[in-house]
Amino acid sequence: MQFRHEVKHKISNLDMLILRQRLGAVMAPDCHAPNGEYEVRSLYFDNLEDKALREKLDGVYVREKYRIRLYNNDPSVIHLERKFKRGALGHKDSALLTPEQARRIAGGDVRWMAESANSVILGFYSRICSEGLAAKAIVDYTRKAFVFGPGNVRVTLDSHIRTALRSTDFLNPHCATVPVPDSPCIHDPEGL
C-alpha cells in the first residue's frame, strides 16, 4: 500500500489567487484539467451517528471513508473510492462503477455488491452491512491542480464548495446544492 502525505489548509481567496500564479510558474497543470480547472462531485457515505465525519473533525489518527466520485458531471467514468488515512498519510483505492451501479448504491440497493470480484466494492458492501453506511451528502467544488514530477508532488486548490445534505441525486447535473457558509479555499499539497 503506497501512501501520500496529505495536508489541507484553509486559505483566503486572495491567497488562492497568489498561489495559482506562483504554482503555475513552477509546476505543470494536472493532466486531468485540460482547461486548467475541473469540477468534482462526491457522494459521501456515513452511518446514522456520522462516524466518518466525526472521526475527521476529531482528527482520529486511523480512519477510512467511502465516496462515489465523478468529474465534470461526466457519468462515463464514475469511481467508488475508499480513502484510508493514517495521520497525515493517505491512501486511496478505487473501483469503476456504471451509472446504474452508482444509482443503485445511492438508493440503498446493494445486494448485488456481494457478488462482485472487486475488493473495494466488497469492502464497501461489508461496511454497509456491518455499520449501516448510507448516502449522506453530495459535495461539489471546483479544483485547480498542479503537479511536479520530482517527488511526486501534487497541489490542489479547491473553491466554490457546495453541498446537498440528505440528497442521493448524485448523477443529476441539476441537483440543487447550496454554497457552504464561509466556504474557504482549500490548499492541499500532496507528495510522497
Protein language model features and the residues they cover:
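Phosphate-end processing signature that detects enzymes handling 5′-triphosphorylated RNA
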Residues: 1-192
